[in-house]
Amino acid sequence: MIETDKLRAAAPERLISPQPADRQEDAVERALRPKRLAEYVGQAKIREQLEIFIHAAKKRSEALDHVLLFGPPGLGKTTLAHIVAAEMGVNLRQTSGPVLERAGDLAALLTNLEPHDVLFIDEIHRLSPVVEEILYPALEDFQIDIMIGEGPAARSVKLDLPPFTLVGATTRAGMLTNPLRDRFGIVSRLEFYTPDELGFIVSRSARLLNVEIDDDGALEIARRARGTPRIANRLLRRVRDYAEVKAGGHITRAVADAALRMLDVDSLGLDLMDRKMLSAMLEKFGGGPVGLDNLAAAIGESTDTIEDVIEPYLIQQGYLQRTPRGRMATHSIWQHFGLAPPRPGGTDLFGG
């Protein structure tokens, strides 16, 4: 099973990775994070739904129903969890699935919640089965059963919990068990952002960072950010560095383009690793089909890195196909590299 920490290790220096790079980047993200739904850009349908559900829960003086947020990394699941707590006017307690190793870890969190508080569990698909078992009655009945004592003297004690809201986030909704998934009343999938939406996010972040940027400059960064706010904000900070040294601190479209070309991020948001693999497919294997092991050997990367770090975005964008015979480049990527795709059926012996 490929998890977040493994993905970070596989590509620690990729500028266009949707995973947070380090604690310093986490701190910057927190500073740039919108605090209210009114400030949140994109995900219009989810935003509207949450606004209605939160307003209704507050009107009835109830805890919001449990919320499951899923989708690719870097799209704002953690941000939405913080916004839910802020809009409800309650505290947020944050943890992650791998941290909750024992039932007692979860019990300690739950028993310290105030009424209507939000408990946010990131990577909730990584909860251990024993912790999940404790969570089920907590979500349904706001009660937990804990064992006191050991051996023959051990006894089960039922503890009442204040009504609370669990917000779970995952990049792998399919790995959630059915009983856990069924206990969420609100289930929302986050989608990739449009360039226009990311342009607004880049402009807002630039204001918070005191960076001068034109609308065209913001859009140029947005177009190369792979539909992901985390990547857009990271690119903005690197373009800011370039602009301060080379352009008097002002980001125009030309400055953004020059900075991103220097950083090896092209007009499709592909970086050196992406282009290395795609060019090998086109030039060494005629566009495929090519087996994963051959492709890994050709570019000097592991098969895990190709499958879990490089491929997902290329497949999602339609630049690469997985077939029973191997990987194949699509027509659009031949065009991007300025090459003519081979004609079906091979060479015409009669020149027709």
From Swiss-Prot:
Reaction(s) this enzyme catalyzes, per UniProt: ATP + H2O = ADP + phosphate + H(+)
Residues where ATP binds: L32, R33, G74, K77, T78, T79, E140, D141, F142, R183, Y193, R230
Record carries keyword DNA repair: yes
Residues covered by region (Disordered): 1-26
Residue numbers binding DNA: R322, R327
GO MF annotation list: ATP binding; ATP hydrolysis activity; four-way junction DNA binding; four-way junction helicase activity
A single GO BP: DNA recombination
Subunit structure: Homohexamer. Forms an RuvA(8)-RuvB(12)-Holliday junction (HJ) complex. HJ DNA is sandwiched between 2 RuvA tetramers; dsDNA enters through RuvA and exits via RuvB. An RuvB hexamer assembles on each DNA strand where it exits the tetramer. Each RuvB hexamer is contacted by two RuvA subunits (via domain III) on 2 adjacent RuvB subunits; this complex drives branch migration. In the full resolvosome a probable DNA-RuvA(4)-RuvB(12)-RuvC(2) complex forms which resolves the HJ.
Protein family (similarity comment): Belongs to the RuvB family.
Protein name: Holliday junction branch migration complex subunit RuvB
